[in-house]
Amino acid sequence: MEEDDVARMLYTRDELVLVLDLYFRRGSNLHVTSPEVIELSQTLRRMDVLPVDELPMPDSFRSVNSVQQKIKGFQNADPDVSGGLYREGKLTRDILLEFREERERLHSLAARIRSRFSTA
């Protein structure tokens, strides 16, 4: 598996819920050094979608760059943003449309997901 393959591994529904929650709370102008992006990257890595230590380039998996790119992906798919609803995967678009008008439900679901992978 090449580094690009690791970076492009499809996000799961739970992972996308967490990213969308951050996008709705903070927008798309988050930098890779933003504490929220760093924390989300760490949470996604703890979710153990794949055994990270067995990947050829483990630092690339759900890295801060990957998280920032996925946040931008939600912006690209957002019909409320000029030029939205293009270039993103079906699951990304579906989750955005599902929760667009139900942000409280999204925040609640995201909190439940985060609590399962909390370090505290």
What does each of the following model-derived ranges do?
Residues 1-120:
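Intrinsically disordered, charged low-complexity linkers and terminal tails
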